[in-house]
């Protein structure tokens, strides 16, 4: 495993712990600058890895990239996804009602306003927004191939409740959130019809997927992320436990499921027409 990968996982697990960088550095007996250097891929001793693992409450092997990584906070999970996406050449996903990497600035704006109404921890909000901004920018620069399957039932709820479905917000903001949701689904229909190179969508018309998952294929390996966290949820939410792994048995099993669902899903003109039908039925007027 490369030192940069150990550093990436160290940062993700630090965010998962909820501890500040200076707090971890103090307990470890190093400077905060030294901790940041570890996160950037500087050489780290095995005894330091052991002590970090104890502090972060993970196994040393997991910190070294061997085994399954578990995350109970959206912040740490999406940071880990960001790291893997930056090296991925292909992304296959059973996703939220949208594919975040190609959403509009309006999506980010309405979500930021909804989160600000609910979450008092400004630093948490800033960290969350920085991660998502970095994910979008990385996609813009690298343009990995992306195949996304969307559940029809989740799209219906998205149109009825709007961006930030699980976030408590004022009636006025909820109305705006529904308008943005309708705009995003309309954009996906347009993207399906435009058929841009390297970007494909399909619609799971008769399937309510039980698991959102992402397969990210890089030059050296494929990573699987199983995700209970929607990209439009509050960073303070605690709704489940996600996992990230490169274990071949997990990756291959999910790849087989994704291939079957892709073959059975609604694509092209039929998918675009179905999305516009859902807009007519469920979007705010």
Task: Show where each model-derived region lies.
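Basic, Lys/Arg-rich alpha-helical nucleic-acid-recognition elements, primarily the DNA-binding modules
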Residues: 1-77
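Short, well-ordered helical secondary-structure segments
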Residues: 6, 25, 31-33, 88, ...
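Residues at structural and domain junctions
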Residues: 10, 20-21, 38, 87, ...
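Alpha-helix boundary/interfacial micro-motifs
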Residues: 30, 49-51, 56-59, 74-78, ...
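Short, surface-exposed, charged/polar-biased interaction segments
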Residues: 31, 45-46, 56-59, 70-73, ...
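Alpha-helix boundary/capping detector
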Residues: 40, 50-51, 61-65, 78-79, ...
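Short, charged recognition helix plus adjacent turn
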Residues: 66-97
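Hydrophobic protein-protein interaction segments
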Residues: 93-284
């Amino acid at each position: 495993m490369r030192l940069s990968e150990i550093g990436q996982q160290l940062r993700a697990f630090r965010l998962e712990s909820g501890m500040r960088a200076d707090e971890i550095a103090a307990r470890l007996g190093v400077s905060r600058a030294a901790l940041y250097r570890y996160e950037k891929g500087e050489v780290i001793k095995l005894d330091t890895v052991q002590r970090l693992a104890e502090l972060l409450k993970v196994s040393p092997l997991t910190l070294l990239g061997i085994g399954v990584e578990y995350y109970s906070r959206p912040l740490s999970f999406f940071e880990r996804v960001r790291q893997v996406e930056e090296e991925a050449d292909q992304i296959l996903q059973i996703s939220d009602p949208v594919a975040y990497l190609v959403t509009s600035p309006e999506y980010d704006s309405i979500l930021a306003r909804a989160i600000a109404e609910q979450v008092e921890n400004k630093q948490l909000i800033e960290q969350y927004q920085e991660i998502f901004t970095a994910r979008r920018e990385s996609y813009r620069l690298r343009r990995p191939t992306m195949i996304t399957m969307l559940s029809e039932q989740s799209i219906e709820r998205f149109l009825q409740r709007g961006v930030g479905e699980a976030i408590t917000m004022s009636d006025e903001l909820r109305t705006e959130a529904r308008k943005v949701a309708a705009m995003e689904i309309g954009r996906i229909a347009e993207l399906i019809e435009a058929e841009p190179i390297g970007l494909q969508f399909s619609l799971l018309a008769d399937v309510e997927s039980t698991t959102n998952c992402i397969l990210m294929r890089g030059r050296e390996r494929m990573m699987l992320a199983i995700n209970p966290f929607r990209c439009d949820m509050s960073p303070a939410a605690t709704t489940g436990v996600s996992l990230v792994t490169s274990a071949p048995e997990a990756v291959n099993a999910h790849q087989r499921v994704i291939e079957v669902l892709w073959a059975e899903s609604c694509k092209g003109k039929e998918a675009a027409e179905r999305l516009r039908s859902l807009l007519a039925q469920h979007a705010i007027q």
